[in-house]
Amino acid sequence: MDQIRLTHLRQLEAESIHIIREVAAEFSNPVMLYSIGKDSSVMLHLARKAFYPGTLPFPLLHVDTGWKFREMYEFRDRTAKAYGCELLVHKNPEGVAMGINPFVHGSAKHTDIMKTEGLKQALNKYGFDAAFGGARRDEEKSRAKERIYSFRDRFHRWDPKNQRPELWHNYNGQINKGESIRVFPLSNWTEQDIWQYIWLENIDIVPLYLAAERPVLERDGMLMMIDDNRIDLQPGEVIKKRMVRFRTLGCWPLTGAVESNAQTLPEIIEEMLVSTTSERQGRVIDRDQAGSMELKKRQGYF
């Protein structure tokens, strides 16, 4: 990795640390949304750097759907314990009582009830006025036009036509009671930046990002990894072992794997150099309806 690239990564690192410190100083009750993915791992690493040698001045929040990969749950608990972080886990009790799941109710309803409503419940329960998220502008078009400080009204809704100007590194965090801000310290990072920084800083990640033989089946053009026994096979479906990895992680029935032989970080970085598709191509929730992500964000999704 040449000096120019190192400088670029250090500039991104400095910007993100500045944003994290700014929020911690400006808001009374911030929280870091922790989805267990690679971006969350980088964001947590940056937060620990921002306040080293002290501890994080805010908790981590995982909005659990009950459908994450088992390796994600194991990684979450291990990471929180290793770093001494306060970890809050919230699962929508109404959704649990209704038995909401992606197979029976579909991705849109599952995401709305278990993720969007679950997140709003948690933010209201603890009274958080700022929430860090690991979203990046290069991931998806609605995120590309969102500010680093993303204003949300008292119902946690986002209005893309009512965003605040951000001149240089000056951010407007003024809010009224009941309103909040979603903050995205990784907005200017790319997927390639994330992977190079993970390699440079030796950041621990969920093993699912690395290629291995895993049990998968093809459904609706997606390679679905079978993580437990909560699936009913459709006629003609066969579970096969294939060499796959994940570019993005979410609920296992809604997250497609990609065929790959990249078993190390340098191999992933090399693979990304020739990739022509978005990492979120395997996320069903991004395409379950027209303008899917923007509609979800307007309703309160992160």
Swiss-Prot record:
InterPro entries: PAPS_reduct_dom (IPR002500), Rossmann-like_a/b/a_fold (IPR014729), SO4_adenylTrfase_ssu (IPR011784), Sulfate_adenylyltrnsfr_sub2 (IPR050128). CDD domains: Sulfate_adenylyltransferase_2. It catalyses: sulfate + ATP + H(+) = adenosine 5'-phosphosulfate + diphosphate. One of its GO terms (biological process) is hydrogen sulfide biosynthetic process. The keyword Ribonucleoprotein does not apply. Keywords: ATP-binding, Nucleotide-binding, Nucleotidyltransferase, Transferase. Heterodimer composed of CysD, the smaller subunit, and CysN. This is Sulfate adenylyltransferase subunit 2. It comes from Escherichia coli (strain K12). The lineage of its organism: Bacteria, Pseudomonadati, Pseudomonadota, Gammaproteobacteria, Enterobacterales.
